[in-house]
Amino acid sequence: MDIISAIRELCKGDKGFENMFDKKKSGGKLASLTGGDRDAELFEALLHGKARSALIEMINDAYNFKEYAVTAHGLLMKDGLSAMDAKRALEIFFTAFGFPGYRDMDESRVAELTDGDSSFSTEYKGEVLNGKEHGIGARTCYSHGKWCHYDECVWINGVMNGYLSAKDLELSAFEVQKIGFVIDDHEVGKTKCFSGEDEYYDDGLKFNVI
């Protein structure tokens, strides 16, 4: 299994994303899933080494992820990784969780899924596995036939986990764009919002692991 598929497999289920940061619960599992691939070792260095704190800050302020990436890269090198290996560790995280510039889809797995009725319905187009949203995709929600919400994210077994680019239609008239990070369908940390010429943050529950 490739490293991206392995990470998403590890994140399946209740608190899967959070448990990924727990070495007792996840340590060695990526190596097992990937057959001992070097990428698994690099990713675990990001999760469990000096860069861990910068990674958590990045999750809680995803709009400014590039700033935290610079810090994390330096901390990975302090842990003994080369500049190229440190860059690769971050690329793996960005790809697994759909950050801008890292959203390539496997076209062989792209499909459309619909759900709901005339009062509320959803349309999903993106990567699908075993009949569920799994991978990069976009979902549009409709209220009585009119769009009301849009999410572009990474889905893991039907649940959003990753960098979120969303749009809301508030009061049936005002479009609000939101950029942040989602864990188990819940926005975490600071979500950057744009409404007309206004910019502001919505503060959600911070993601934190010991």
Across the structure, where does each feature detected by a protein language model lie?
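Glycine/tyrosine- and acidic-biased, solvent-exposed loop/turn segments at the edges of beta-strands
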Residues: 105-210
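Charged, amphipathic alpha-helical regulatory modules used
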Residues: 1-106
